[in-house]
Amino acid sequence: SFKRGKSNKVALLQLATEDKCFLFRLNKIGLTASIARFFASEKIKKIALSSKDDFAALNKRRVIAQKNVFEIQQVIGNYGIEELSLQKIYAILFGKKITKSQRLSNWEADQLDLKQQLYAATDAWATLRIYLRLLEIEEQLKRDYHLDINSTEK
């Protein structure tokens, strides 16, 4: 059973693309060689938020290389955002709240209920949306900076 403050193994791995989310029950399938290869791949960019503890816990099961991982918490301050939680960063960037009511749920349950599945998928999807929004901000800053340089040369 789940208890607040108790350290648990990473039970669930959430992966999101722009149109799909995949939930891997690590407590059921384990940390497979395929998952380890995924994290070790230089070709696949992995976007994470608050992943340090999760990677530490995963490495207790099986040492995995972490290549091409973009950790949002390491760069979010560069965008003038001091918050580090997914919910707060999302609210700042999009002006909308995402629910975190299932956070203290039992992720090792035999079956995840629909609320848990939606929470986990939303968590992964929101992380990807944050990353894509940061890229948009970066591009806008580049365009603005370029325009500013051109306007001062006239």
Tell where the protein language model's regions lie, with residue ranges:
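Conserved DEDDh/DEDDy metal-dependent 3′-5′ exonuclease domain
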Residues: 3-100, 104-119, 126-133
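Mixed-charge, glycine-rich, non-catalytic linkers/tails in nucleic-acid processing enzymes
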Residues: 118-154
